[in-house]
Amino acid sequence: MVQQQQQSQQRMMELHERNDREKLARKTEKEREEERRKQEDDKILQLEKKLEEFQENARFIGDLASNFQTKYQDALNGRIYTLVRGLQDLDRMKGTFSDKKVPLDLLPYLDDGKNPCLYSKHCMEKTLEKNKAVNGKIEIYKKFRAHLMKEFSEEMPDLVMYYRSIREDLDLS
């Protein structure tokens, strides 16, 4: 009896230890996932920073070139060099975003200076319209089938009864 109690206690301790190990594994898995998300966010922030720097350099070069004076030649050359270096940095960064897909339809929105969320909104609206159209077609086919079965049941009741016995899942409401 005492030996059975000891074995039972030992099994309970083993179960508790295993549960603790599983909790720790789940916790570390959550921490790893959180760390991955943080790294992704850091990459995106770094890309945003580089793009903003590139945009600012391009704007400044445009200002210098539109009001060009020879005394600003060195500043213009420096900005062009910075712009080229920024493009090289962006080219190096492209490998870290190879798993990201950007729809080509989004680019005209960005070119027009529109918010990218507008693109998402328009896509959702188009999808809703298509869903409504498809749901309408489905309803029309259901009504057609019900009407057809009604007409068949008036003309050929025996055949319709046989058909309904085969297709028990048929809902004609």
From Swiss-Prot:
The subcellular location is: Nucleus
Q: Using the UniProt record, give the first listed, main subcellular location.
A: nucleus
Low complexity bias locations: 1-10
Keyword terms:
Activator, Nucleus, Transcription, Transcription regulation
Q: Which GO terms describe its molecular function?
A: transcription coregulator activity
> Which Pfam families does the record associate with it?
Med10
Q: Provide one Gene Ontology cellular component.
A: mediator complex
How would you summarize the oligomeric state and partners of this protein?
Answer: Component of the Mediator complex.
What's the protein called, per UniProt? Mediator of RNA polymerase II transcription subunit 10
Question: In which organism is this protein found?
Answer: Caenorhabditis elegans
